[in-house]
């Protein structure tokens, strides 16, 4: 342990010099609007009528939106809009969460239901759908598309009624109100809210995740924007052509039937709906490092710290929906918001049109996962294939297919697997670990008796520190050897059974080799030669 702490302190000092330069508040990216040539490739879509505050009440849009220093809709404008809709529609209920942001801002959300259901008493045999936006505060089409959906539902009562025959919907339009206020990606404390889903460093993350776990949705969406002007090619004169990038949850500990439902039904329909709206799309990607001259793009990964996968590990269909918007201020905002609205409407309509298949597949997947004795996946890899990706030449706005290497996660390939334990045993000295699991919606039983008997233990054979300081820690790659031993644990120890719906979140958090495990993030610090203090029951 001494070596770990010493290295951590050294890394803290070094990290202060190599980390991104952040201040308290207003960590805003530079604005680089599209040239007239590029802008011509993203024209307004004829017939667009968006029912959200930035478009129905343009006088409420702050001046800073035009130069990239503010979003288009202040908290009070958003709340007033939501309250008015709720007063006019009996099936819309306005709520304020019983928690606040790091700077004390409110979290308003809407609950949509044709019955008298609630989060605590959901409708029987209906889909539960969670929709969130505004996770990153400088991605305004995310929360605006959520507000546009609410306005669209209110303006189309027959469509709303058809949806609510089959589902109850919770809409949390603004996940990060402090970030929106400062028009920055991060929380007020400069943690990335979309990288905190396993380590749970911030109370705000825990509060929202507890609300999510209580609602226990079948379907969820996470609305974001991506950087518009990221350039590629030898001359840096090509950019992504897409209006929309999207991805389902990819972690291999999500039931395969649920993952296939996401890919084969929802993703295919979404692509068609985006094209039908006169927009362009591709799978969500990030740029990778490559030893070849060809551009390497990585499909959305499997890491559980990302909201898309963390939500999916509760065994539900999840989509990350991104629109083209970071760094261009108010440019093309109608088209951007429309892109988000088209994606979320596609998900809702697909679920209703295929209700029996969707509901039964997810419910069967939950039962199959809960009762499974299959091995769990600790690490995986992304096979690389050749394909093309839609690009735009910034010189003449030509649209073309650009050849790339593509690291695919549809599906990823398992590398390290381990037998699924019947349960985990956690000593009473680790109540903070149990609390984190409970935030995930994982149940833990406190034993009134001491446990004496055989367990599987993990002996740490290697700990490798990352080269970068990341959100308060130096992450580690841990290797272990599984051994059997007898143990005596005192009364008050915790038993975490794995025959429960959200157990996959326990797998990724408690198995040390996982990239986002508690051991990786130093929540449970270990050194080479240690025995990991969480035990497995066969």
From Swiss-Prot:
Subcellular location as annotated:
Secreted
Signal peptide limits: 1-21
Region span, Disordered: 53-76
Documented EC number(s)? 3.4.17.-
Q: What is its main location?
A: secreted
The record's annotation in Pfam families points to: Peptidase_M14
Query: Binding residues for Zn(2+), per the UniProt record?
Result: 136, 139, 224
Q: What class of enzyme is it?
A: hydrolase
Question: GO CC annotation: what is one?
Answer: extracellular region
Q: Which residues form the Peptidase M14 domain?
A: 71-351
Q: Which UniProt keywords apply?
A: Carboxypeptidase, Glycoprotein, Hydrolase, Protease, Secreted, Signal, Virulence
Q: What is this protein called?
A: Carboxypeptidase 2
Q: Which organism is it from?
A: Trichophyton equinum
